Amino acid sequence: MDTFLQQLVNGLTAGSVYAVVALGYTMVYGIIQLINFAHGEVVMIGAMVAFTVINALAPTGLSPLAVVLVGTACAIPVCMLVGYSMERLAYRPLRGAPRLAPLITAIGVSILLQHLAMLVWSRNVLAFPQIINNTSYTLGGASITNVQIAIIAVCVALMGGLALLVYRTQLGTAMRATAQDPHVAGLMGVDVNRVIAATFVIGAALGAVAGVLYGTYYGVAQYTMGSILGLKAFSAAVLGGIGNIPGAMLGGVLLGLVEALGAGYIGDLSDLCAYGWIADFMSEQCAAAGHFILFGSNYQDVFAFLVLILVLVFRPSGLLGERVGDRA
């Protein structure tokens, strides 16, 4: 039971980050039906910028919280600029092109941003500054740290803030109108180009914060970190229903839980070595290591992509998505 509760805590923490990143995918897709595969690299840039700023400010004597906040405050505008430039220079000229063209462009932008980051920060795995001391609390047999609590709280606040923006503001109304029908929205006075640009900028800002949270939680940053993180967040968006904001939130949390529970419970087959033909079949592995691991924490990515495959096969519209026909 304690293990189950611990994996729930770990899954909620990781899933909260996935949910925030997934919002960037689902917002863009909801507006222009584009899967922005470069969004993971925006998250990576946010983590890298924060890494640089936090490293520079850590020896100055500022409080750890202030240092992290300044690092995040520096990462957000940089990522917003990257997101705006991406939309303005790479995607807007292709808005009327066949859907495959912007998709290929998104992959190209992703590779470009990766290599630019490699030139700036090197190809090495960077140790993200751990300047906030971890304090553990016991919750029903599970251990949860102050960092995990902060990550979950920040992600919940971001998701709540985005929901208010989308459903309670004039910009949100314009975004929903553009998602429904850009042509009609334009006829009604909505500046469609500005709304689309704002969507990219908001998604990039969320990605910047997610990058800082991810680096703080896992303690590492690298120029390739956006690839797997981005694909996991995309899986979360598909799981919840791509283009559906509540679906992205739900999908992110569920994906984090599936990963954590899968890594925690599936994989240690050591007990099977004691039984009959299984012992004979795996005797070499058991004799060499004393146990046989099929999955586990080293293979937790498998569970994320298995979820993606299963959803695409059995429910392509996602948990909260609606099946709609192609636009005329």
Residue locations for each model-derived region?
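Helix-loop-helix "hairpin" substructures at the membrane interface of multi-pass membrane proteins
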Residues: S143-T224, I245-G251, L255
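Alpha-helical transmembrane segments within multi-pass membrane transporters and channels
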Residues: G61-V109, L116, L250-L255, E259, ...
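Transmembrane helix-bundle core of multi-pass membrane transporters
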Residues: P93-L94, R99-R168, V195, G219, ...
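Single transmembrane alpha-helix segments in multi-pass membrane proteins
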Residues: F4-V53, S85-A101, A237-P246
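Transmembrane alpha-helical segments in multi-pass inner-membrane proteins
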Residues: Y18, V68-A73, F200-G207, Y214-F305
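Membrane-interfacial amphipathic/re-entrant helices at transmembrane-helix boundaries
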Residues: M1-V21, V49, T60-L69, A97-A101, ...
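Membrane-embedded helix boundary and interhelical linker motif in transport proteins
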Residues: V9, I31-S85, L89, V220, ...
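Hydrophobic core segments of alpha-helical transmembrane domains in multi-pass membrane transport
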Residues: A47-T52, A75-V82, I107-A117, V154-A163, ...
